[in-house]
């Protein structure tokens, strides 16, 4: 497992370097104002967001703390299909992954799962030739997908709390999730247990339930 972990660390550093070469710092007066609010609430230094030169619509954060928004997402913002506050909710979500340690946790967890999967696949291949390795990889994918979905819900919760505390609220977070399938062109199927992300509907319901529980708690 340690060999896989070291390999993951090395791959992560290489990935961070590649992303930095394909990106530039993002500056926008609307977004910058929201970032200043986040900096104040979280007591952060200079919070920088990078534009990654990729066409797909996505946001991500690397273990070294860099937050990236793809050029495809920025293009939708410039076209008016995504508002500044909706784009800010993506940044809040990525901050959630970073603050909750998801990026570093995944290095360890996924490396461990990969190592265990290799052992299981080897054993199953002897018992069930040809299909044993396929079953092992499938089980590994189920575990990884389940953990990834859990992280997404947690990052959404963190983002919701940050957006509420900054005076923005969860409305832009929910409105973006509602249009996410249309923007990405990827429609969620009814079966989500093999997917890395929960469906937009599941995420919206979780945010609404969470906010309702906070309001009830205040009362």
Regions found by a protein language model. Name each.
Residues 205:
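Cysteine-cluster motifs in flexible loop/terminal segments that predominantly coordinate metals
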Residues 1-198, 202, 211-218:
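A Zn2+-metalloprotease active-site environment signal
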């Amino acid at each position: 497992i340690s060999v896989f972990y070291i390999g993951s660390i090395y791959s992560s550093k290489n990935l961070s370097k590649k992303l930095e070469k394909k990106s530039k710092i993002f500056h926008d007066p609307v977004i910058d104002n929201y970032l200043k609010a986040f900096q104040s609430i979280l007591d952060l230094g200079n919070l920088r967001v990078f534009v990654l030169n990729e066409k797909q619509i996505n946001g991500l954060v690397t273990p070294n703390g860099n937050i990236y928004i793809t050029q495809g997402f920025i293009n939708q913002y410039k076209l008016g299909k995504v508002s500044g506050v909706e784009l800010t909710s993506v940044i809040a979500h990525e901050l959630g992954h970073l603050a909750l340690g998801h990026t570093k946790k995944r290095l360890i967890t996924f490396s461990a799962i990969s190592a265990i999967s290799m052992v299981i696949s080897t054993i199953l291949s002897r018992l069930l030739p040809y299909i044993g390795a396929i079953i092992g990889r499938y089980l590994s994918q189920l575990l990884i997908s389940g953990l990834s979905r859990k992280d997404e819900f947690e990052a959404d919760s963190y983002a919701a709390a940050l957006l509420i505390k900054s005076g923005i609220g969860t409305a832009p977070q929910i409105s973006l999730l509602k249009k996410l399938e249309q923007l990405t062109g990827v429609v969620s199927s009814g079966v989500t247990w093999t997917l890395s992300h929960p469906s937009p509907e599941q995420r919206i319901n979780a945010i609404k339930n969470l906010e309702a529980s906070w309001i009830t708690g205040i009362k």
